Amino acid sequence: MKRIAILGGGPAGAFAAERLASAGLAVQLFDEKLAWEKPCGGGLTYKAYSQYPFLVDNDIPKRFVRETVLAAPRAGEVCVPLSDPLVIYSRLDLNRMLLDRAERAGAQIEKTHVSEVRWQGSAWEVRTPFGTADADFCIVATGARNSLRNLGTQLKAGDTMSALGYYVPGEQARIDIQFLPHLEGYIWIFPRCGHLSVGICGKGEPAGSLRKRLERFMSERGISAKGARFYSHLLPSLDASSWHENRVAGEGWMAVGDAAGLVDPITGEGLYYALRSADLAARALLSEKIGQYRRLLARDFAADLEFGSRLAKRIFLGRFLFGAVPARMVQFTRRSPRFSAIMQDLFAGRQSYQELKRRLLRNLNGSLYEIAMSLGFSRLVPRKAG
């Protein structure tokens, strides 16, 4: 029986463990902390739970969010109804559920620190404070702060973004997204079970500066940070030039989730890509087509994330029709049903970045017409003779 060592017990590692153990492989999962919280983590799109229905068909506490409010300077705000709701868990609860599923499938869960992983030519030696374990193959799921230098992606300074936030008492039904000037990122308010997650993510700006932006926003909204729990996390956010050299596999190993750099460079979403990459890695291993893993990732979603990395700066910092792109996005969503439908599909995960430009151009004339009509220009359009 093939022996598999999974290094990391987050969603990617836990799901890979379940998939491989269910197929009859001997799986050991090593993680120092196991289930833990993240600043915003726990949000699942329709794309995720439609492919993996167990993500909603369970008794774990969760929130179904059916509207998002987008806001930008000089544009006000707009409500985007979500026909396919976002599902929000406590990341702690979601991670614990995935680990429980892995254990029920037969995986051996080890709460311990991995001090060293050594390739012995035909097998791995995994060292922990309690001894060593041997494995024929390694799945690397150690997250963005991967201490195993020879395994997983190699993040450069420009390949990360900071995410930080507070858990504060409160209740609301919607998600708030606030764009800010000169920020390649955004502020969020996510409703959770029993509290709110108020946070910020941004690329190319120090965490201290992001925290000041967030606390200024919270003060303006009347949200107190006093006594609130603070969290921070590093997210992969690969530059366009980094995707082609992204190290996702090697002799005797594959990386999944954040450890493979597989995070949406625009939204910062990583949960779907953690689960999906774990699934694809398990398939490649079980079919003994490990060399095809990179190709499977590219065909499934990585090529789209690479394309998204080229769009990110233009979306957050670019200009269109003499205004900032985020402001135009809010205004177009408010005035154009066509554009609002595009935004809904983006939130659901149905709209790829590769097809986004074509869809926007295809709908541009119609969207501009709808905007003109909504602004009162219908009075200037001659009516057809009845």
Predicted feature descriptions by range:
Residues 283-386:
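C-terminal helical "tail/cap" subdomain of flavin- and related membrane-associated enzymes
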Residues 4, 25-27, 138, 175:
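Hydrophobic anchor at the start of a short beta-strand
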Residues 44-97:
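A conserved beta-strand/loop capping segment in the N-terminal third of enzymes
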Residues 21-40:
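Glycine-rich FAD pyrophosphate-binding loop
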Residues 1-10:
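Beta1/beta-strand and adjacent pyrophosphate-binding region of the FAD-binding site
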Residues 13-14:
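N-terminal Rossmann-fold NAD(P) dinucleotide-binding loop
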Residues 9, 101-228, 244, 261:
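Predominantly flavin-linked oxidoreductase catalytic cores and closely associated redox partners
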Residues 116, 132, 206-284, 290-294:
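FAD/FMN-dependent oxidoreductases across multiple families
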